[in-house]
A protein has these predicted regions:
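Active-site gating loops and adjacent loop-to-helix segments of metal-dependent hydrolytic enzymes
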Residues: 62-93, 135-155, 218-243, 266, ...
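Alpha-helical scaffold segments that flank or form the walls of functional sites
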Residues: 64-129, 160-176, 417-419
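His/Asp/Glu-enriched, well-ordered alpha-helical/loop segment
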Residues: 236-243, 284-366, 382-384
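Active-site microenvironment of metallo-dependent hydrolases
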Residues: 1-11, 16-21, 26, 32, ...
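Histidine/acidic-residue-rich catalytic or RNA/ligand-binding cores of hydrolases
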Residues: 218-231, 256-261, 278-287, 301-316, ...
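Metal-coordinating catalytic core of metallo-dependent amide/deamination hydrolases
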Residues: 121-255
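Active-site glycine- and acidic-residue-rich loops that bind
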Residues: 111-114, 182-197, 275-277, 341-343
Length: 440
């Protein structure tokens, strides 16, 4: 996915330490590098840049198979109730499984934002994945929120900002820069002006990006709580700008798209999750205004190929045009464009000399991928995460022969299954079902 979107045939890649140092015809490089320490035979295979997911909540994998039919982000009926019954150890192992799945499926970079993101940071680092990590702050009183009221709490705000800044100070730049921090907020309706302005100040002081859910169906709530239109409030609090990653933005009008574009705000587009909520973001209109857009997985899912297909399908449905957004376009959104959203396009997102060696290798000689008339189109429309054979991050092989090398997959599957079962048992005992009642 270089600037010319070339598909190179019978080429080899040379990696030294964490970078791509040579790229050229195989017959030339094989002669020049006969003494290479490690050789990966990719004959009959396709090498792609690793996928970049600009938005993740790995701990939310506990809701897989529970939340997809509950509608919009089910904060009151699932998220808040579950937070009161699940243990840290259960969340930790479920999050570890989600990270492992992402790596296994060719995802080499994520942006993980969650209320207790530091819980997942040690495993994220040891897994070998590249990541931005941030505490997803809000300062509402949760007891009041559970009853349908929005009340901001000064004590909560102080604690949340301290936690977010603390994570950044402890984790930013770890593992040679593979782990970075991000300042993150849940959304506008759950965040006071003081919280968001404090987050903005912290991001400026630490030189970090900001990520926040915007334009995702809280328009009326924001106006009710803050007495401001959603993007006016975002502007007031410093939540639009060249270092801001807005997430979702499916509920935006033309004026709001102009505000996003003129401010230089980037978009983490999560089409697969949006579809399950019956929503489609107007990315063609955003791109026409010059917005930088990249893809994100979001929470319950892990197969990035499904995200690519959802991106294409949703764009074509919205445009009523079967030729909008090609396979090449979608692949770019999931690699170099998503890297640009995170400010990493100078380092990752394409296979070019001097860039980080973040790669995935897929064997095309298998059912579902044959015949391969066009490797990009075949993979985008027919590939799956389970087809990925090898994954390299920072020059290190983290997946080999379809198995993650940095974690015990079998143990994680068992432990995460047990953790989820225990958490849902407590949930159903408390609420009488697997979905809590809506607040009055």
């Amino acid at each position: 996915v270089d600037p010319n979107r070339r598909v190179l045939t019978d080429y080899s890649i040379v990696i030294a330490n964490d970078k791509i140092t040579a790229l050229g015809p195989s017959h030339e490089l094989e002669n020049l590098y006969r003494d290479a320490t490690t050789v990966i035979d990719a004959a009959g295979k396709v090498v792609l840049p690793g996928f970049v997911s600009a938005h993740n909540h790995v701990g939310y994998a506990v809701f897989r198979g529970r939340a997809e039919d509950v509608g919009y982000a089910p904060t009151h009926r699932l998220y808040l109730p579950m937070s009161g019954v699940i243990t840290n150890s259960e969340r930790e192992v479920i999050g570890a499984l989600a990270v492992t799945e992402l790596l296994r499926g060719g995802v080499t970079t994520i942006l993980e934002m969650e209320e207790d993101a530091e819980l997942f940071a040690p495993f994220i680092e040891s897994s070998g994945i590249r990541a931005f990590i941030g505490v997803m702050v809000n300062d509402v009183n949760l007891d009041a929120l559970a009853s349908g009221q929005t009340v901001f709490d000064d004590t909560v705000r102080t604690q949340q900002l301290s936690q977010a800044i603390g994570l950044a100070e402890r984790w930013h730049g770890r593992s040679g820069g593979r782990i970075q921090a991000v300042m993150a907020a849940n959304g506008l309706s759950m965040s006071s002006p003081a919280l968001l302005k404090g987050l903005r100040a912290a991001a400026d002081d630490l030189g970090l990006r900001v990520s926040i859910h915007l334009g995702f169906g809280e328009r009326e709530l924001v106006e009710s709580v803050h007495h401001r239109a959603q993007f006016d409030y975002a502007t007031d609090c410093g939540m639009l700008g060249t270092d801001v990653i807005a997430v979702h933005c499916y509920d935006v009008d033309e004026t709001e798209i102009d505000m996003l574009a003129k401010s230089g705000t980037s978009l983490a587009h999560c089409p697969h999750m949006n579809q399950f909520r019956g929503e489609v973001a107007p990315i063609q209109a955003m791109q026409s205004k010059g917005m930088q857009i990249g893809l994100g997985i979001d929470n319950y899912f892990s197969d990035y190929f499904e995200v690519l297909r959802s991106c294409i399908a949703s764009a074509r449905i919205r445009a009523h045009d079967p030729e909008v957004l090609s396979a090449q376009d979608a692949l770019a959104l999931g690699t170099i464009d998503a890297a640009a959203v995170m400010g990493l396009d100078h380092e990752i997102g394409s296979i070019e000399i001097g860039k980080k060696a973040d790669l995935q290798i897929i064997d095309m000689r298998r059912l579902g991928l044959t015949p391969t008339n066009d490797p990009v189109a075949t993979l985008v429309y027919h590939g799956h995460g389970k087809d990925v054979e090898t994954v390299i991050v920072d020059g290190q092989v983290v997946v080999s022969n379809g198995r993650v090398q940095t974690a015990d997959e079998d143990a994680l599957i068992t432990q995460a299954s047990q953790a989820a079962t225990a958490a849902w048992d407590r949930f159903s005992q408390r609420y009488g079902s697997f979905v809590a009642p809506a607040p009055n």
